[in-house]
Curated annotation (Swiss-Prot):
Binding site for Mg(2+) 2: 180, 182, 234
Region feature I-domain, mapped onto this chain: 123-254
Record field: compositional bias (Basic residues): 361-379
Subcellular location: Nucleus, Nucleolus; Nucleus, Nucleoplasm; Mitochondrion
Keywords of the record: DNA damage, DNA repair, DNA replication, Endonuclease, Exonuclease, Hydrolase, Magnesium, Metal-binding, Mitochondrion, Nuclease, Nucleus, Phosphoprotein
Full protein name: Flap endonuclease 1
The species this protein was found in: Debaryomyces hansenii (strain ATCC 36239 / CBS 767 / BCRC 21394 / JCM 1990 / NBRC 0083 / IGC 2968)
CDD domains referenced in this protein's UniProt entry, alphabetically: H3TH_FEN1-Euk, PIN_FEN1
Length: 379
């Protein structure tokens, strides 16, 4: 889910932190990608014309493998080096959100069954997408595919977004890529969104620069995290009735969640907002400030040449993909990863010193002219 309303709030109050560009603008970059979010996207988006997920002859879902294979090739063809990060065990505090998702999924399954005989294809697809979840088996299949492709992946001990941010902070990669806005709470220098969307959607890539967000909002890290918790995150419920506008106003007025809670608790007659009983906002704050991650210095990322015959065995013989397409994709991978991705030009040039203003130039010219006249007079 991420943080409710954060994307729009940043666009409104910190527009200088936002950039939009095309995939080609990221050439030469290494990027840590939230794999679990990607697989979820692929299971929803990669479908047959009738709306069903891709399957092989045995009826096994293969949408996630198709998406991972072809979107990764697209990144490599644009001289981008991806590293995928998989979720580990979720924090205990996230249990409530996961339970809500399970209930929503079960309700969607019931709705889908109710309209099975009389509903339209569009209705069926809509409810079908709501039932999607990434299984452990699908995660393992994606990891096996990445190994054969020669693309590195990291198993995060906990949240994938936090590990992506750690790799970016530690200089292993340029940016963290995820659709979850709570990624920005873990301090990646840059957050990229829409990176693995299909070309057909024609969505530009969003880049959010963390330091510029804090600077524009005039907040330190802790205050920004408090804002995100107040907006609504996966770790705890928020204060009922508090939307983005009110949350921003309260944080600006009081400076922290502790003071907001104190004010609302001590002044029930001045506000309609009620703090949830035993609200674990402080525990949520600690999870954002000190997430469970592997230190970037301990992670060794290595991109290798793809195992073409291994890909044929796995993707064609076991999963039912077209051999011609897999071989063609493997050749593109081979070409893209051969010898490493080309470095960016901005790494070879230093900034040009700011030119002197015209007044300085004029003074120099006047001085030079005066010296010239004096020399002629002496002759």
């Amino acid at each position: 889910m991420g943080v409710k309303g954060l994307n729009q709030l940043i666009k409104e109050h910190a527009p200088e932190a936002f950039k939009e560009f095309q995939l080609k603008n990221l050439f030469g970059r290494k990027i840590a990608i939230d794999a679990s979010m990607c697989l979820y996207q692929f299971l929803i988006a990669v479908r047959q014309a009738e709306g069903q997920q891709l399957t092989n002859d045995e009826g096994e879902t293969t949408s996630h493998l198709s998406g991972m294979f072809y979107r990764t090739i697209r990144l490599v063809e644009n001289s981008i080096k991806p590293v995928y990060v998989f979720d580990g065990k979720p924090p205990v505090l996230k249990g409530g959100e996961l339970e809500k998702r399970l209930l929503r999924r079960e309700e969607a399954i019931k709705q889908r069954e109710n309209i099975k005989d009389e509903g339209t294809i569009e209705d069926m697809v809509r409810y079908e997408k709501r039932t999607v979840r990434v299984t452990r088996e699908q995660n393992d299949e994606a990891k096996k595919l990445l190994e054969l492709m020669g693309v590195p992946y990291v198993n995060a001990p906990c949240e994938a977004e936090a590990q992506c941010a750690e790799l970016a902070r530690g200089g292993k990669v340029f940016a963290a890529a995820s659709e979850d806005m709570d990624t920005i709470c873990y301090q990646p220098p840059f957050l990229l969104r829409h990176l693995t969307f299909s070309e057909a959607r024609k969505m530009p890539i969003d880049q959010i620069q963390y330091e510029k967000v804090l600077e524009a909002l005039e907040m330190d890290r802790e205050t920004f995290i408090d804002l995100c918790i107040l907006l609504g995150c996966d770790y705890c419920e928020t204060i009922r009735g508090v939307g983005p506008v009110t949350a921003f106003k309260l944080i600006k007025e009081h400076g922290s969640l502790d003071k907001i809670v104190e004010y609302l608790t001590n002044n029930p007659d001045k506000t309609n907002f009620k703090v949830p009983e035993d609200w674990p906002y402080d525990e949520a704050r600690k999870l954002f400030i000190n997430p469970d991650t592997i230190d970037a210095s301990e992670v060794n990322l290595k991109w290798k040449e793809p195992d073409v015959e291994g890909l044929i065995q796995y993707m064609v013989k076991e999963k039912g993909f077209s051999e011609d397409r897999i071989r063609s994709g493997a050749e593109k991978l081979k070409k893209g990863l051969k010898g490493g991705v080309q470095g960016r030009l901005d790494g070879f040039f230093q900034s040009v010193p700011k030119p002197k203003d015209s007044a300085d130039k004029k003074r120099k010219n006047d001085t030079k002219s005066a010296k010239s006249k004096k020399a002629k007079t002496r002759k």
